[in-house]
Design a protein with these regions (language model features):
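Iron-sulfur-associated redox domains of electron-transfer enzymes in respiratory
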Residues: 1-131
C-alpha cells in the first residue's frame, strides 16, 4: 500500500477487507477472512468504513503494514471501494480466479480453506517469509 504510517511505531497490522456480497463466492471469501482473523495472522476490517470515511477505520487502514482485499467475483466491489478511498498497492485476491464459479459454488469448508490458504500465501510472500 502506498500510504505509510506517520508514527514512529514501525507500522501497523496486516489488515483484510472483503466484499461480503450476496453470492456464494462472496460468502466463501468472507468466511476465509473470518478464519484468518481468528487465527491471528491478519485482522479483518470493515469495508463499509472506507466510503463512510470512518475515522477509526481510515486511520487503521492508513497505518497498515499490508492490506489484503478479497472479492468474491470480477465485479471487484472491495477493490473498487478501496481505490475510491485512496488506497493503492494492496494485495488483491478474487475467489472466482481460484476456479469457483459465482452462484454455482456452494459454501464448503474445503472452499473456505482454499481461499484462506491462498490469502496466507499472498501475505507471507508480501512479508518476505520463506524467501
Amino acid at each position: 500500500m502506498n500510504i505509510r504510517p506517520k508514527c514512529g511505531c514501525g507500522g501497523g497490522a496486516d489488515l483484510m477487507f472483503c466484499c461480503s456480497g450476496v453470492a456464494d463466492t462472496a460468502e466463501i471469501g468472507d468466511r476465509a477472512v473470518r478464519l484468518l482473523h481468528k487465527e491471528g495472522g491478519a485482522r479483518m476490517y470493515c469495508l463499509a468504513g472506507i466510503p463512510a470515511n470512518a475515522e477509526l477505520i481510515m486511520n487503521g487502514a492508513r497505518a497498515a503494514e499490508r492490506i489484503l482485499v478479497i472479492d468474491g467475483c470480477d465485479t471487484d466491489c472491495a477493490r473498487l471501494t478501496m481505490e475510491a478511498g485512496g488506497f493503492t498497492g494492496f494485495l488483491h485476491l478474487r475467489v472466482t480466479d481460484l476456479g469457483m464459479e459465482k452462484t454455482k459454488s456452494p459454501v464448503t469448508e474445503e472452499r473456505v480453506e482454499r481461499v484462506a490458504r491462498h490469502a496466507r500465501e499472498m501475505l507471507a510472500v508480501a512479508q518476505g517469509v520463506g524467501q
